[in-house]
Amino acid sequence: MSQDPYTPPPLPKPFTNTTPPPTLLTQGAEAHLYKTIHLNTNTPAALKIRPSKPYRHPILDRRLTRQRILQEARCLVKLVREGVNVPAVLALDWEGQGGENGNGGAWLLMEWIEGLVVRVVFERWEAFIKASGGSLGEKELRREEEKVRGLMRGIGGVVGGLHKAGVIHGDLTTSNLILRTGDVDIKDGESPAMVGDVVLIDFGLAGQSSSEEDRAVDLYVLERAFGSTHPQAEKFFEEVLEGYKDSYKGAAVTLKRLQDVRMRGRKRSMIG
């Protein structure tokens, strides 16, 4: 039985006649991400659309969607002000008109971050290490490991800045980190460059919090992501924590709480 082709929700009015039209990059349960053009500056931009949920009551739908898009935008604005590497907010709007028949969708236009998703960087590096088949000399291997350590410290640094600003990401994975690098078109089988600024993206689950528990859980989610997605790089995760300590003075308390979160995670794994 064939499935009907997916039809994304209609684009917001400001983007219905742009040239070129917005390009759909990803689609999730909560949002769709497009690459488009910022009309005022004619530069690339990221457009995140939170479509209306037809199964929700229209009033509740509009209220929740508006609340979530505003929360995401406020976190980004605060982080930009604090000097953390995140996309700048360019514009946003929500559709709250029309009574019970109104659309509850909302959209957020952000700075386009050029670079490689960190998940892809690590995947290419692990593929390079595997393809080398142990043929790397001691100096080459040490150089490769130093590259990974440097990137890990950069990740820890940007997460430390995030927490210092009083924001929790809520979904820290290597898919939500971008490395600003000119080495985008590297060929398969080559070792990727790991030099550049690390930028945090996708703040759909973010919120403002000063809770050490929330910060520790953020770090734990990132640690688990490395364990499940990048097993060869996982052994360097302590470098993330070193970078975190360098950029956030309150790190000692958070890292102590991280030990508790790890223990609870292990107990849940044992119980199943």
From Swiss-Prot:
Catalytic residues as annotated in Swiss-Prot or TrEMBL: 171 (proton acceptor)
Subcellular localization: Cytoplasm; Nucleus; Chromosome, Telomere
Residue sites binding ATP per the record: 25-33, 48
Function recorded in the entry: Component of the EKC/KEOPS complex that is required for the formation of a threonylcarbamoyl group on adenosine at position 37 (t(6)A37) in tRNAs that read codons beginning with adenine. The complex is probably involved in the transfer of the threonylcarbamoyl moiety of threonylcarbamoyl-AMP (TC-AMP) to the N6 group of A37. BUD32 has ATPase activity in the context of the EKC/KEOPS complex and likely plays a supporting role to the catalytic subunit KAE1. The EKC/KEOPS complex also promotes both telomere uncapping and telomere elongation.
Gene, per the UniProt record: bud32
Name of the protein: EKC/KEOPS complex subunit bud32
GO molecular function, one term: ATP binding
PANTHER family: EKC_KEOPS COMPLEX SUBUNIT TP53RK, NON-SPECIFIC SERINE/THREONINE PROTEIN KINASE
